[in-house]
Amino acid sequence: MIAIYTIVCLVLALLLIYFWLYQKVSKHIPENYPNAANLQKIDSNKKTLVCFGDSNTHGNVSYNWVNDLRSELDDYWVFNAGVNSDLTYTLLRRISDVIAAKPDLITILIGTNDVNATMNIKMEKRYQQLGRIGKDISPNFEDFKANYQQIIQILKQKTSAKIAVMSLPVMGEDLAHEANLRADKYSEFIKQLASDENLLYLPLREKQKAFLENNPQPLKHTFEETYILLNYSVIWHYIFGKSWDYVTAKHGFQLTPDNLHQNSIAGGMIRDLVKEAILKNK
């Protein structure tokens, strides 16, 4: 009887942990998201920066470079408008939150999940189950381009902000993998769009690829293992208190703990590119 009771308690504890982690990853919103409550706190003596994107901006399953900017940019009020698992489709749903902040500068880092959703039907279904895309939507390059162009047009029409767009971070550290080849294609579009629309272009992908090319090392895991690596990363970080850098090293990578997200080196590259853009455009 005691053994059964112990097993039941263990199962319940594991379910509670799973539910908590699911909420942490899938439902969490940054504390400095531009919602109504936070908009009331804006310091009118500062400029407003809104960082718009997915988990690589959100920073709760990835290094939080936005928090670095909050502590380093004394003359900016910094909002984090990143949400885990978002695609260009979902940025369009949330774009009114960015507009409401009346930003002076907007950074956009989006596309990793748009690419990831095209890699196999299981990933597409996961984004559907999370409610990021409709059941009838199959993400593709043409939709990505149309969505991104619409995001830029809306922001240009409804804000007076400077807009800085970033090429995609590496998707795993095998640069010859199909995921990275697709991310190259998506990033080439972003670069061209920046030129066509007179936007600031931040070459994140170029910077990360150069780092990996200059520091080659054999890989322990493939891109196909991403989902399980992500689960392990979240457990290591939130259950055992390990840093994203620790998880990165454990998984045999240099820039990412799980093929999709950023450690402090990769996140630092994003932070520094944004800071450079601000300094050049004061």
Residues covered by each model-derived region:
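Alpha-helical cap/lid subdomain in secreted, periplasmic
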Residues: 43, 71-72, 90-282
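Core hydrophobic alpha-helical transmembrane segments of single-pass membrane proteins
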Residues: 9-14
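Feature marks short, highly hydrophobic, charge-poor N-terminal signal-anchor/signal peptide-like helices
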Residues: 1-7
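Generic intrinsically disordered, low-complexity segments enriched for polar/acidic and small residues
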Residues: 2, 15-19, 30, 49, ...
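Serine-esterase "nucleophile elbow" of acetyl-processing enzymes
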Residues: 17-105
